[in-house]
Amino acid sequence: NFLGTLVNLAKKIL
């Protein structure tokens, strides 16, 4: 899931 990966990356950055 691309969207899930994007959210996961955002959570790691934030």
Curated annotation (Swiss-Prot):
GO terms for cellular component: extracellular region; membrane; other organism cell membrane. Expressed by the skin glands. The modification Leucine amide is found at residue 14. Its main location: secreted. GO terms for biological process: defense response to bacterium; innate immune response. Transmembrane segments: none annotated. It is found in: Secreted; Target cell membrane. Keywords: Amidation, Amphibian defense peptide, Antibiotic, Antimicrobial, Immunity, Innate immunity, Membrane, Secreted, Target cell membrane, Target membrane. Antimicrobial peptide. Has activity against the Gram-positive bacterium S.aureus (MIC=16 uM) and the Gram-negative bacterium E.coli (MIC=64 uM). Has a moderate hemolytic activity (LC(50)=50 uM). Belongs to the frog skin active peptide (FSAP) family. Temporin subfamily. This is Temporin-1CSd.
